[in-house]
């Protein structure tokens, strides 16, 4: 696999290289001996260890089997796929516009049965109104100097909301109370968005919890993330959207979501927080 100019992907390759190096050291085998056993040129080991080349799935299997570290294979393979997808995702954002970015995960959304959302910055996307989407996407386009195909992006994102009403999809959503009060848009748009939360939480497919401000925290406020079944996590950072597929990392996000959900209030208590946010609009 050829090198990517993306700094995120480069960092991921270096991290994978460090893991390969640690596995090699723990095995007591030299790079020369590994290369000989694998039938590789010794320079290939150097490229993999130094992160200049991203290993293929077969490279990882061979490396780990020679080093007697087969248990590392699933996480390493997942990590290499994460590294590659980071770059592809960023390239799509920069070259193809926001509509394309909204459409990249449609098949994943349709296949997912249980969605888990933790939202510390924005409303969960299945419950966003078009007006709120416009405000968020406009700010995003301005900050990242992205193509402003906002109408098309709104249409693509809105189309995904049909999953709330179709099939056997379930949505577990946890929000920080501060999200209710962040003025991402004007008061009319915010009132409509907050009203949409009230409507959405009554759907049989939706569980909406809100972590009240001032709650004694068992787990700190963190970046917005979403979990798709138990297979994939997306984390939203300022510089990039990060894909996580390594099983042990996913397990940490599942644990984190469970703890955050345990700090939230639901039902009438959540409705009271939303109603108070509507009342606070001027």
Language-model features, listed with the residues they occupy:
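A generic structural signal for short coil/turn motifs at secondary-structure boundaries
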Residues: 181-185
């Amino acid at each position: 696999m050829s090198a990517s100019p993306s700094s995120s992907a480069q960092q991921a390759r270096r991290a994978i290289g460090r893991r390969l190096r640690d596995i090699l050291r723990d095995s007591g085998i030299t790079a020369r001996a590994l290369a000989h056993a694998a039938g590789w040129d010794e320079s290939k080991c150097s490229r993999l260890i130094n992160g200049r080349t991203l290993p293929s799935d077969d490279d990882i299997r061979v490396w780990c089997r020679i080093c007697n570290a087969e248990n590392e294979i699933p996480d390493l393979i997942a990590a290499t796929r994460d590294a590659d997808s980071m770059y592809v995702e960023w390239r799509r954002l920069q070259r193809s516009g926001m509509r394309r970015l909204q459409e990249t995960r449609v098949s994943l959304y349709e296949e997912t049965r249980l969605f888990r959302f933790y939202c510390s910055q924005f409303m969960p996307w299945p419950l966003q109104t078009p007006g709120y989407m416009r405000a968020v996407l406009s700010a995003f386009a301005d900050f990242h100097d992205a193509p402003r195909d906002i109408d098309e992006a709104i249409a693509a994102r809105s189309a995904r909301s049909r999953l709330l009403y179709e099939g056997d999809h379930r949505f577990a959503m946890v929000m920080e109370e501060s999200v209710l009060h962040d003025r991402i848009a004007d008061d009319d748009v915010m009132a409509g968005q907050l009203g949409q939360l009230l409507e959405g939480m009554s759907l049989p497919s939706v569980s909406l919890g809100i972590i009240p401000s001032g709650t004694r925290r068992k787990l700190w406020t963190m970046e917005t993330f979403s979990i798709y079944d138990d297979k994939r996590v997306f984390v939203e950072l300022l510089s990039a959207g990060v894909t996580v597929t390594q099983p042990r990392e996913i397990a940490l996000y599942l644990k984190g979501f469970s703890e955050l959900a345990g700090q939230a209030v639901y039902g009438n208590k959540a409705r009271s927080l939303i109603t108070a946010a509507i009342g606070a609009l001027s």
